UniProtKB/Swiss-Prot annotation:
Positions bound to Zn(2+): 251, 254, 271, 274
Source organism of the structure: Methanosarcina barkeri (strain Fusaro / DSM 804)
Keywords on record: Metal-binding, Methyltransferase, RNA-binding, S-adenosyl-L-methionine, Transferase, tRNA processing, tRNA-binding, Zinc
Name of the molecule in the record: tRNA (guanine(26)-N(2))-dimethyltransferase
Function: Dimethylates a single guanine residue at position 26 of a number of tRNAs using S-adenosyl-L-methionine as donor of the methyl groups.
GO BP, sorted A to Z: tRNA N2-guanine methylation
Signal sequence, renumbered to the chain: none
Recorded catalytic activity of this chain's protein: guanosine(26) in tRNA + 2 S-adenosyl-L-methionine = N(2)-dimethylguanosine(26) in tRNA + 2 S-adenosyl-L-homocysteine + 2 H(+)
Listed Pfam families: TRM
UniProt: S-adenosyl-L-methionine binding residues: 41, 78, 94, 123
GO molecular function annotation: tRNA (guanine(26)-N2)-dimethyltransferase activity; tRNA binding
Class of enzymatic activity (EC top level): transferase
SUPFAM superfamilies: S-adenosyl-L-methionine-dependent methyltransferases
Gene encoding the protein: trm1
Amino acid sequence: MIYKTIVEGTTKVSVPVPPPDATFPPSAAPVFYNPEMELNRDINVAATAAFVERLLAKKELLREEVRYVDAFSASGIRGLRIAGEVGIHATMNDWSPEAFELIKENSKINGLEENTLATRKSANVLLHEQKYHIVDIDPFGTPAPFLDAASASVRGMLSVTATDTAPLCGAHLKAGIRKYASVPLNTEYHSEMGLRVLLGACARELAKHEKGMLPLLSHVTRHYVRTYLEVLPGTKQTDRTLKSMGFSIHCPKCGFRGPVYGLAVHIEKECPVCGSFTQIAGPLWLGPFREQAFCDEVISELEMHPLNTKDKAKKIITFCRDELDIPMFYDQHVICKELGASATGIEILIEALKAHGFEASRTHFSGTSFRTDAPITEIKEIIRALSW
């Protein structure tokens, strides 16, 4: 295997380069490095740094006492960046013997042997054995089989990536039900559906360990969902968290959507707007998927670090911060297609909604999506008026 040196942030690592005549996809290599996830890792550095500052502000821990684990490390790039750029101890785990050796080599390259630990174990075994302040689950595919062990291990922040967006978003319905014990719907807001299904799964797994959660930052970018959750121990926090769980109603005929809070609820099957039969998604997370103050802290950390994707990262976090806390978003183009109307600039539509007395904002999910508390009938009337 040929290796090359790459640089992310201030961290250098040696990563394998599959031969040009390889008959397997890059993800099937003995050690997988994905350059497309640099943005994810840049945001991870800033978000982890922001959370560590919160931990240190409580004056219960020293920086050298904070423990972070990357349960699926491959080359070690994610954990090494946390150790070197955030300055806390990082455990990097991978079951692959090739990855285990490469992690140790890359630790030496960065002079981080004293601040890191390489382990070669099943992720679930390691997480059931050890407690960590920050647990990072970034597997290839679904994180579902590892959420229980991660919930048992975590003491401060749980960071989770999911790349199985088809099951999460409803494109592969049965797989989504099997993995997440939730019914997703493949709607125009399927990306938000996937995020809320994942958050709901995390909330339910944490609840089994009498832990609640506060979503600090969540985003859907390219082919993956990523979330950072502050973990709050105790039954009161757990019960408070579960109050943000529920179901989402969707009318495929008129576009109505609305939340129903609670895990044991009666849901009317008829759409309150047009009387058609509705579809039901859930259980899923209906609460905010980010904390505005934390977003500001992450943006500040992004400014302080030399990052290749800084501008893209800041744009994503800013959009997340400024979104309304109203599930689920609307897509202007979908509504315009239904009405046979011409689309205007998204900012023009948002200002028109506000002028009519409604709340409205853009979202980070797409350039044509928006949130509002306006009823679907009012949204359509405003779009019709703007298209003339």
